[in-house]
From Swiss-Prot:
InterPro entries: FluC. It comes from Thermus thermophilus (strain ATCC BAA-163 / DSM 7039 / HB27). This is Fluoride-specific ion channel FluC. Na(+) binds at residues 76, 79. It is found in: Cell inner membrane. It is a multi-pass membrane protein.
Amino acid sequence: MGVERYLLVALGGALGSLLRYGLGAWVQGSLGAGFPWSTLFVNALGSFLIGLTLRLSLEGALSGEARLFLAVGVLGGFTTFSSLSYETLALLQGGEVGKALLYAFGSLFLGLLLAFLGYRLGGALVG
């Protein structure tokens, strides 16, 4: 694997992290504290976009380099499982068991659903 591929992933990851920070700050500022809305939003959007991106890649509508940049780089930097884990733990430690369970399982369900919908949309766009 050439150094160019690593650079694509690194640049995409930097872009994805910047997008997560900016969009996350806007979402949390808009919806308020008390629930990790920003992480839920970026992970849900990222799940949809990874489904779409990977389907387009599988159908040949994206090159291998575009897939690396978008799926591994941008969306890898955009989504965050570690924040989901930490925020769930913080809710549990704060005694908010119901919120923690809703957040953890809701995030998983929403992520899977949106990845599926993105995948289906990708198929419809090229099929």
